[in-house]
Amino acid sequence: MPQKDPCQKQACEIQKCLQANNYLESKCQAVIQELRKCCARYPKGRSLVCSGFEKEEEEKLAMKSGSK
């Protein structure tokens, strides 16, 4: 049986917040930050819901190294 995603709760909170605020990300920054904090606590690949943030970080690093 697969393990429960450790950051699933935070991802669900983001969905609830977005739905309650007409999908305005600016209104949900606090809950988005909580998910980022959760993702930072676990190794890469441990949480499926964190994969978007991991990809975002990889792209930022690639842009930095390419602009030198």
Curated annotation (Swiss-Prot):
Motif stretch (Cx9C motif 2): 28-38
UniProt keyword Manganese present: no
One Pfam family cited in the UniProt record for this chain: CMC4
Keywords from the named record: Disulfide bond, Mitochondrion
Name used for this protein in its record: Cx9C motif-containing protein 4
Family: Belongs to the CMC4 family.
Lineage, highest ranks first: Eukaryota, Metazoa, Chordata, Craniata, Vertebrata
Gene3D superfamilies: CytochromE C oxidase copper chaperone (1.10.287.1130)
Localization (cell): Mitochondrion
GO cellular component, one term: mitochondrion
Tissue localization of expression: Expressed in many tissues.
SUPFAM superfamilies reported for this sequence: Cysteine alpha-hairpin motif
Covalent S-S links between cysteines: 7-38, 17-28, 39-50
Transmembrane segments: none
UniProt short sequence motif Cx9C motif 1, positions renumbered to this chain: 7-17
Record InterPro entries: CMC4, Cys_alpha_HP_mot_SF
Written domain comment of the UniProt record: The twin Cx9C motifs are involved in the recognition by the mitochondrial disulfide relay system.
Organism per entry: Mus musculus
Annotated ranges, domain CHCH: 4-46
